[in-house]
Structure formats: structure tokens, C-alpha cells
UniProtKB/Swiss-Prot annotation:
SUPFAM superfamilies with a match to the protein in the record: dsRNA-binding domain-like (SSF54768), Ribosomal protein S5 domain 2-like (SSF54211)
Comment on protein domains: The N-terminal domain interacts with the head of the 30S subunit; the C-terminal domain interacts with the body and contacts protein S4. The interaction surface between S4 and S5 is involved in control of translational fidelity.
Keywords: Ribonucleoprotein, Ribosomal protein, RNA-binding, rRNA-binding
Gene3D superfamilies linked to this entry: 3.30.160.20, 3.30.230.10
Cited NCBIfam families: rpsE_bact (TIGR01021)
Single GO term (MF): rRNA binding
The protein, known as: Small ribosomal subunit protein uS5
Membrane spanning residue stretches: none
Organism encoding this protein: Pseudomonas fluorescens (strain ATCC BAA-477 / NRRL B-23932 / Pf-5)
Length: 166
């Protein structure tokens, strides 16, 4: 794993996806602030992302980590991979994720890789199309993971057995 991750007392894996310097132009010159995008997960299906802004980088990262811990979702995984292939989009970013066999690893780029690693997905094939803006890619990945349901829950909603829907 990269040097961007840390283990916390609560057992969460934290990853820094992006730090960006932004400038506000005022009469006296420019005011620089920093934005941070982070993802947090327990490696067992719980994952969250957050954004933070501050005049200093460490404060922005801390705010983003706190926001990520407040914004956690539960993902229904099939062992160490996804339940089924899916597409998702946010803005101009489109992501495609599909389950992979054991031993494949996480084949995904940048921001998607960080989300999938902290979520506990170990075998997946993923591709990002359109805009590769990390914020939109993380949003799109979350939309897809949040919408994914296990076959058992789908069968229960339809009042059928798992074999009938598979």
C-alpha cells in the first residue's frame, strides 16, 4: 500500500485521494486555501468519502477524514469481489466495475482504486470513462457501490427464491 494510508484506533483504513490548492483573488492579492478528498473504510464493506477545506493542508485533510467517517455506507460484497458488473456516472465521469476471479487483484486507476481498497474489494476489473476528475470518479464509484444489492435481498423484495432470479 502507498504512504497515503493510515490505520486508526477504530480499525478504519484512511486514504488521501487528492489535495488541491485553490486561490481566491481579492483586492490585496490572492488568498490560497487547500481542499482535500479522502476515503475511509474498514476493509469489510463499510466505506465513506469526505472533502475538507482549510488554509493549511493538515487541517483540510483532518476535516475530510471526519467528513468521510460521517458519510459511511455499507456495501454488499460477494466475498472479496462485487456481486455483479455495473455502470455508474456522476457528472461527466462514468465508471464500469465488474467482479473478477480470485487472484486477479484490483485493476482500477487512481481514485477508484482507493475507494475499492478501503471498501475491502480485493478482486475487481474497473475502468473510468469520460472525465477523470477524482471528485467525480469517487462520487460515481460510490453511486455504483451503494446501488449494488445482494441476490438474497433482490429475491426477498420480489418474493422469489435466489435460484429463480439467478
Amino acid at each position: 500500500m502507498s504512504n497515503n494510508d493510515q490505520k486508526r484506533d477504530e480499525g478504519y483504513i484512511e486514504k488521501l485521494v487528492q489535495v488541491n490548492r485553490v486561490a481566491k483573488t481579492v483586492k490585496g492579492g490572492r488568498i490560497f486555501t487547500f481542499t482535500a478528498l479522502t476515503v475511509v473504510g474498514d476493509g469489510k464493506g463499510r466505506v465513506g468519502f469526505g472533502r475538507g477545506k482549510s488554509r493549511e493542508v493538515p487541517a483540510a485533510i483532518q476535516k475530510a477524514m471526519e467528513a468521510a467517517r460521517r458519510n459511511m455506507i455499507q456495501v454488499d460484497l460477494n466475498g472479496t469481489t462485487l456481486q455483479y458488473a455495473m455502470k455508474s456516472a456522476h457528472g461527466a465521469s462514468k465508471v464500469y466495475m465488474q467482479p473478477a476471479s480470485e487472484g486477479t487483484g484490483i485493476i482500477a486507476g487512481g481514485a477508484m482504486r482507493a475507494v475499492l481498497e478501503v471498501a475491502g474489494v480485493q478482486n475487481v476489473l474497473a475502468k473510468c470513462y469520460g472525465s477523470t476528475n477524482p471528485v467525480n470518479v469517487v462520487h460515481a464509484t460510490f453511486k455504483g457501490l451503494k446501488a449494488m444489492q445482494s441476490p438474497e435481498s433482490i429475491a426477498a423484495k420480489r418474493g422469489k427464491s435466489v435460484q429463480e432470479i439467478i
